[in-house]
């Protein structure tokens, strides 16, 4: 489900926490507003890690920003403006994002491009932390 209830909380210390699109899912556990869900999901952000997030509404981002400030985590927001769709058909879509070109995504929809941008942002952050991740 994510956040403070996520099974990955056993990994200490995490180097990165990734929060994708926050919606009104699992409200009986996570909370009944987007802001409450953001607070619960931001429980995965631990001291000293990098937090990578899907662009959200200002009120949701404020909750996540507060958690990052509280624990000393650096916040990175995926930049959707840098997504350039090259082509799409029934097999998926091809896009450019920042320094990455002609990436093939076998899923359709803008939300899938946004999820890919979050994943690429996380990979870039991990490269900056010294992880060997090639651009391929």
Predicted segments, located by residue:
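Switch II (G3) loop of P-loop NTPases
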Residues: 1-4
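Short glycine-biased active-site loop of nucleotidyltransferases that positions the nucleotide triphosphate
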Residues: 6-11, 87
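Short clusters of hydrophobic/aromatic residues that line enzyme substrate/ligand-binding pockets
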Residues: 8, 51, 103
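Intrinsic-disorder/low-complexity coil detector
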Residues: 12-13, 105
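Acidic, Mg2+-coordinating active-site environments of NTP-dependent enzymes
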Residues: 14-99, 116, 120-136
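A short glycine-threonine-serine/GTX helix/turn-capping micro-motif
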Residues: 104-112
